[in-house]
């Protein structure tokens, strides 16, 4: 993916987030700690695996971890710097997830920068509702 394409995904995502935020006041809710960012599968599981430097994807190692905003940024930079060939060869990404992962990284980067998230809560993989590792207060879900 070119830098232009990556940045276009960020810009378009932030445009959609602006409309969403204006309608629902998400930024204010995040600042008041009433709203959390939760990632449940896909790109976030890859970010977790790469962050942990796993030799191959291991669901039990990734499930339930949290990654700080600065660490998410570092992992995204690492994945971007791999290039397509590097992502395809990476044991936690591979050829089937390479394109989706880099697109997902752009979307996550858009979320983090748009809402100034410095420490998103992240529950990886299945995020079972009865799991103690899931950082969601289930009483607030409707």
Language model features: what each stretch is:
Residues 1-142:
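Helical "lid/coupling" subdomains associated with nucleotide-phosphate turnover
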């Amino acid at each position: 993916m070119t830098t232009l394409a990556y940045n276009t995904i960020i810009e378009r995502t932030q445009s959609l987030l602006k409309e969403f935020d204006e309608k629902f006041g998400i930024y204010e809710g995040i600042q008041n700690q009433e709203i959390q960012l939760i990632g449940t599968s896909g790109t976030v599981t890859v970010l977790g695996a790469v962050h942990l430097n796993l030799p191959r994807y291991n669901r039990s190692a990734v499930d339930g971890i949290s990654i700080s905003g600065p660490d998410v940024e570092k992992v995204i930079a690492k994945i971007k710097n791999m290039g397509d060939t590097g992502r395809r060869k990476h044991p936690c990404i591979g050829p089937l997830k390479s394109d989706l992962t880099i697109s997902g990284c752009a979307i996550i980067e858009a979320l983090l920068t748009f809402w100034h998230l410095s420490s998103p809560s992240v529950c990886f993989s299945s995020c079972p509702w009865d799991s103690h590792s899931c950082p969601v207060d289930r009483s607030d879900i409707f």
